[in-house]
Amino acid sequence: VYRMPKMLTAKQYMEVMDQVRFNSGESGYDWKSIMGEDLYNSYMDGSNEGTNWVEAIRNKNAVTTSHSLNVTGGSDRSTFSMGAGYQYQDGVFGNVVKSDYRRFTFRINSEHVIYRTEKGMDVVKIGENVYYQHKQNQGIQIGGQYSNELSNMLRANPAIPMYNADGSYTKAEDLKNWVDNYNSYSVNPVYKMLNQQSGHNKSINQNLHATGYLEIQPIKNLVYRGQLNYYQGTSTWRAFLPVFDANRTNADYYRTEDKATNNMSTSWGWSTTNTLSYKFDLQKKHNFDVLVGTEYSESRPDFGFSLNATSSNSVFGDMTHAYMSYMKNNNAASVTGTPCDDTRSMSYFGRVNYNFDEKYMLS
């Protein structure tokens, strides 16, 4: 991260909160009794600046790597291009939780002349484009202005320590004085993040796009193109919510029974595109390019479906085994499923391009 926000120290934070009270005609907080004398004194003498929560989840050594391999070749009648790529990225925020993205791609394109006249005009051509993508992602919550982990860290109290003296995270029992005497929503945001979906989630997506086409040119510059498009995609998402106790005043800050969620969806579809184009000129100055076409696509309920399942009380209590088969309460599991939408569409389109002596253009 090139530029990090400058955060308040614990001492500055306490001064600001006291000033808010003073402006309302109230006395300042009794910080010493809230946090304990030793911690209070370390803030006051500057030996301890408090917790920089944004820095706590910053991944200073985030790695990005990308590799690709491409091969091209052919002849005067056939050409091909093939390539594969791999990309990996560490999340710049996360640090204490796994946050990364990886993607593998493969593509192949080729075109072949089936019939060529003696004068060199390609009458019949066929070709295809195939693209496959595999993505895997796990990370922190990033959506919404307030419902994301960076926002939580920016708004968190720097006077609350992240760790106890023994190295364990501060939890509800350690923050009782904060909850009772300062703010009932006082929480260690890193400990909360560790026990939410931000720390325990994984998604895998696979997509295949394939196109095959036929081009016929019966006379020069009059080209018919028929194209068949196919798409197939699958996605899975798993999340595990462990037992934790960050603050008992908010239902989102503690959990007495772990929970796992499994989502999956699969779908496929197809479409056809047919176009007829013609290029011609008048008196070598008036140049025309005319195209007309149609496209049809459809999706049916039997082309795929989505499934969502949630259950509680895991046998192993970890993300590795966050599957429905490892949950003890499967008899009470919530399971929902929906088919793909039933849709069909037919479209007609056309285009005319004109230029005068390659100086003026109109479309």
Question: What residues fall within each predicted segment?
Answer:
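Beta-strand-loop-alpha "switch" segments that mediate conformational coupling across diverse proteins
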Residues: G85
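Ligand-site clamp/hinge motif
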Residues: Q89
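Residues on the lipid-exposed face of transmembrane beta-strands in outer-membrane beta-barrel proteins
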Residues: L69-S75, I108-H112, A210-I216, N274-Y278, ...
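Active-site-proximal binding-pocket segments
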Residues: L362
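Short Gly/Pro-enriched turn/cap motifs at secondary-structure boundaries
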Residues: I57-N61, C340-D341
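Outer-membrane beta-barrel channels and translocator barrels
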Residues: T64, S75-D76, Y115-M121, Q217-I219, ...
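Surface-exposed loop/interface segments of Gram-negative outer-membrane beta-barrel transport/assembly proteins
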Residues: V1-G50, V92-Y101, T105, N109-N207, ...
